[in-house]
């Protein structure tokens, strides 16, 4: 099984690309945000635990997120591997993910990072706000903060993965199809 991390700042298109890449390479797209919401909506034991934590305004602990991902991996059959979107968010989470994968005879094979010019990110987010009606994508100050937070949080993970030879920057400029081709070219070397 092959496992990819996909990263990119807000507006980089990682969600759009993840869906297409997962389909092309028969990977299970694991979006932790979607998984958290689904567990809570389904009222599972894990969902109840997370709902209680979140209702107090606290972050879901790493071990709970890892438990949720491990459950998904353990119950996924017929997939060539996994595409992690939105996780890990810290070096500690990266280490926990590696440990959990190692226990299953797997590893992180590559960290794909979409690189997009700042002005293009802002343009994409504003355009997305027009379509989605998300007010936070219309406010330039909020956009700037989201991009800054991404850089601050992701840089240590990039450095960690780079030291392990896993970091692969990918040009995220151009059309959706152009970016998809570039990502696919990197991934097909490992799948």
Identify the meaning behind each predicted range.
Residues 1-191:
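Glycine-rich phosphate-binding loop of ATP-dependent small-molecule kinases
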């Amino acid at each position: 099984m092959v496992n990819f991390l996909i990263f990119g700042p807000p507006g980089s298109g990682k969600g759009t690309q993840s869906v297409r890449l997962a389909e092309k390479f028969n990977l299970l797209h694991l979006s932790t945000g979607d998984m958290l919401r689904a567990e809570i909506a389904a009222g599972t034991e894990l969902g109840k635990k997370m709902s209680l934590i979140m209702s107090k305004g606290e972050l879901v602990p790493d071990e709970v997120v890892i438990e949720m991902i491990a459950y998904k991996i353990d119950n996924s059959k017929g997939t060539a591997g996994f595409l992690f979107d939105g996780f890990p968010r810290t070096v500690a989470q990266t280490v926990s993910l590696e440990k959990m994968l190692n226990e299953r005879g797997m590893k992180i094979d590559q960290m794909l990072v979409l690189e997009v010019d700042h002005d293009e990110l802002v343009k994409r987010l504003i355009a997305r706000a027009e379509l989605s009606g998300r007010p936070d994508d219309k406010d330039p100050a909020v956009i700037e903060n989201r991009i800054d937070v991404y850089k601050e949080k992701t840089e240590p993970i990039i450095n960690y993965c780079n030291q392990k030879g896993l970091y692969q920057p990918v040009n995220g400029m151009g059309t959706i199809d152009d970016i998809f081709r570039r990502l696919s070219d990197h991934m097909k070397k490992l799948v």
